[in-house]
């Protein structure tokens, strides 16, 4: 009986050592050496203080800021520990209420709703944590942000263009705008004037 369990125990210990200790240790050292910013969460600093991550969305609802996608996380928006979509189907009345609520917020902030609203401004993402919006969603908000900041639309559009990332490797994904980075650039541009 002892000879039956010995190989099982040896394989178990070896697999735990390799997959639970050696592999994670090697990947941690590799990540810290080759991609230190990404391995530490792609943190964004302002004035020597961490203000967020380039990978996790934040809630902006003041008219002078660009707004990101809705967050479906609970108990609070953009809760990284509670990542997940709303799973609301297209016929669910709760989705309709959520979209109407966001449209009302856009209207209350002075956004012109005469043009079609980009879908990423009124719906949540699958993760509920998206830090980026489409260039169309950013462009849709330019007039409101420029008016709230007393800046020229052209200056705000230039910042949007400067913070628009293209497709990864030229083919993967869609062009996108990181909302936190864009809002920090807006603050810096306004402070410089």
Swiss-Prot record:
Keyword Ion transport: yes
Name of the coding gene: kdpC
Location of the protein in the cell: Cell inner membrane
Oligomer status and interactors: The system is composed of three essential subunits: KdpA, KdpB and KdpC.
Main localization (coarse): membrane
Function: Part of the high-affinity ATP-driven potassium transport (or Kdp) system, which catalyzes the hydrolysis of ATP coupled with the electrogenic transport of potassium into the cytoplasm. This subunit acts as a catalytic chaperone that increases the ATP-binding affinity of the ATP-hydrolyzing subunit KdpB by the formation of a transient KdpB/KdpC/ATP ternary complex.
Membrane-crossing residue ranges in chain numbering: 7-27
An example Gene Ontology molecular-function term: ATP binding
Protein known as: Potassium-transporting ATPase KdpC subunit
Key words, A-Z: ATP-binding, Cell inner membrane, Cell membrane, Ion transport, Membrane, Nucleotide-binding, Potassium, Potassium transport, Transmembrane, Transmembrane helix, Transport
Entry similarity comment: Belongs to the KdpC family.
A cellular component term, taken from the record's GO annotations: plasma membrane
UniProt keyword Nucleus present: no
Topology of the protein relative to the lipid bilayer: Single-pass membrane protein
Domain of life: Bacteria
InterPro entries per the UniProt record, alphabetical: KdpC
Organism: Burkholderia mallei (strain ATCC 23344)
């Amino acid at each position: 009986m002892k000879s039956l369990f010995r190989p099982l125990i040896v394989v178990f210990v070896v697999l735990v050592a390799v997959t639970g200790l050696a592999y994670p240790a090697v990947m941690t050292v590799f990540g810290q050496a080759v991609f230190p910013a990404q391995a530490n969460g792609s943190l964004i600093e302002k004035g020597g203080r961490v203000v967020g991550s380039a990978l996790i969305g934040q809630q902006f609802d003041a008219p002078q800021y660009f707004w990101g996608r809705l967050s479906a996380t609970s108990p609070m928006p953009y809760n990284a520990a509670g990542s997940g979509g709303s799973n609301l189907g297209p016929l669910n009345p709760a989705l309709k209420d959520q979209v109407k609520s966001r449209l009302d917020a856009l209207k209350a902030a002075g956004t012109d709703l005469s043009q079609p609203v980009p879908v990423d401004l009124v719906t949540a993402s699958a993760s509920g944590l998206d830090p980026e919006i489409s260039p169309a969603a950013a462009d849709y908000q330019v007039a409101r942000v420029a008016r709230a900041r007393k800046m020229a639309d052209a200056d705000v559009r230039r910042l949007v263009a400067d913070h628009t990332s293209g497709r990864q490797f030229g083919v993967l994904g869609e062009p996108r705008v990181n909302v936190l980075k864009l809002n920090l650039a807006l603050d810096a541009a306004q402070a410089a004037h």
